[in-house]
Amino acid sequence: MDGPPAVALGVEKKHGNVMNRPPRPVDEGLPNRNDIWLIFYLGAVMVTGTLLVFFLAGGGLETCDGLPLSDGTNLPFDQAACDAGVETEISKWESYADDKFIHAQTMTLSVFIMFQLFNVMNCRSQEESIFSLGVFSNKAINIAFLVSFALLLFFVQLADFTIPFTSFEIGGLLSTKVLSLNDWGIIMAVAILVVVIEEFRKFIVNSRIFAIDGRR
């Protein structure tokens, strides 16, 4: 779903200081070292946030034998029942496990996509803040963002909707389930961090404190 926003970056207008930059060395690769560092740095932010949401949503449940719930051969555990040595009701806990894990998967998918959409804003410039560029100044990105977000909402919030003339639910296409407003609040709060952290980096880089010979 990040395809349309990525394409929309191609119509980003040139920025005011582009002619003030020295030319790239002829032997400099694409991506260069700075590009590679940014890829790993922002990638680490998004991976960390995605894993955090997965475990906050209950994806890290364990079984009585201490193995992850993601191992399909295991059942989630009721700690009190395990401590007492009481055998759990398999069918009940299987149903709980499936529902809990699909919920975690849906939140993980959603936050990963939102990370990508918000990161498109970062990619408009490696040096300039999106606020100085104008958050909504690239109309193509705005439209692409809304279209991609609408598709995400379609597959998540209409997960229980049965496709006409079939018995197949939309959620079955991507193994999603409907999320609550609170879930979306967590997703947005975590995903927007990729913009906050990158804006802080740009502020530090552009700060006069770190300027060399008066250049920024």
Language model features with spans:
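C-terminal transmembrane helices and immediately adjacent loops/tails
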Residues: 1-216
